[in-house]
């Protein structure tokens, strides 16, 4: 039969510096066990370790490549996996099967930019700190903050959660 590959998961989103976890299996049953090889397609700025190509991988192999995305945008990395049958008596490729692709979005490390409206305020005044981010991820960046208590200073409310870019912190001090 023509060798086929099953990839689990086929689509994934990971954080910068994380490892993938893709299992290679095959429903095909040739006379000798199917083997797999893969190549990687990635943007130039992204690093994949190991970078591939790799071959002679057995069914049940889990790809655990680490992917580093130093940019401020989500990047798509593709792993093209090809199954094949082997020559009798060695592990050389005999018949190439039907390849399939794993699609991995690699999120950037989120960054925050804060812009205070004033650098000096009076007791009882409100701050005006604008939150923004250069990060372009697959989903909108969100922020949370807390203040570090200082003796004799009260900050109200002093914390925030699930804040979108463009939000202005207006705590009273």
Q: Can you describe what each PLM-predicted range is?
A:
Residues 1-173:
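Extracellular low-complexity Ser/Thr/Asn/Gly-rich intrinsically disordered segments
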């Amino acid at each position: 039969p023509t060798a086929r590959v099953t990839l689990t998961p086929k689509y994934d989103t990971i954080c910068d510096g994380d490892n993938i976890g893709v299992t290679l299996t095959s429903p095909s049953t040739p006379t000798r066990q199917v083997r797999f090889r893969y190549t990687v397609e990635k943007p130039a700025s992204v690093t994949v370790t190991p970078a591939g190509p790799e071959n002679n991988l057995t069914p049940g192999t889990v790809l655990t490549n680490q992917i580093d995305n130093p940019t401020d945008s989500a990047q798509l990395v593709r792993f093209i996996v090809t199954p094949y049958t082997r020559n009798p008596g060695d592990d050389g490729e005999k018949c190439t099967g039907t390849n399939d692709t794993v699609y991995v979005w690699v999120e950037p490390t989120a960054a925050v930019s804060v812009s205070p409206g004033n650098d000096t305020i009076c007791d009882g005044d409100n701050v005006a700190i604008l939150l923004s981010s250069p990060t372009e991820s697959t989903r909108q960046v969100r922020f949370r903050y807390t203040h570090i208590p200082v003796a004799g200073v009260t900050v109200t409310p002093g914390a925030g959660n699930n804040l979108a870019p463009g939000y202005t912190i207006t705590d009273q001090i």
